Swiss-Prot record:
Its EC number is 4.1.1.100. The keyword Lyase applies. Disruption phenotype: Cells lacking this gene are unable to produce aeruginoside 126A and B. One of its GO terms (molecular function) is lyase activity. This is Prephenate decarboxylase. Keywords: Lyase.
Amino acid sequence: MLKFSMEFCYPQPDVKTLIVGTLGPKETSSEQTLNYLITQWQAEQISVTSHLFDTFTELKEALLQDRVDLALVPHAYERVNDFYMEPSLKLGFVFTYPTPIYGLAKRKNEELVWENCTLVTHPAPFPLLPYLLPGYPHQKNIKVEFVNSTSAAAIQVKQGLADLAITNENALKENDLEFIAEYGKIEMSWSIFHKKGTVHRE
């Protein structure tokens, strides 16, 4: 059986505090994973401040400008190579952690009108659409728009800017929506990046 292990690389020796960034707004899959990491760091007596960014591009710039110590990025991000290929950045850790349940959501207590329906989604879970809405390829009356996160998609539906969203269960609850179809959790792999420099290994 194939096995390998990797030690987490801190950006500085004897670290006691960390500023960690990932994709927002509140209740993204990335934030859920960051909250899991925070519990692990707190168990090691490390104080963590989290920052949520509108895009991973903004997160990368914040890391390069030393506004965060670490950047948490899912491998589903279509431009994750921007982090790997940045000469100033170093991979600190790779791990797996599941997302919340994903599904297709609408506003509660509202009948869905399919004619000229607008569906919003982050690009990463867009391939789930044929599973969530089996007749989608043949429905010409659905307009698809891309947004920066699953949480942003849920917010747009709540605000009446869209009719449907591919979103996660946390964002669904936060924005008082309901699923009309569920896919389940995604077994996601994640990378943590920091700027190159002196690194401490546990």
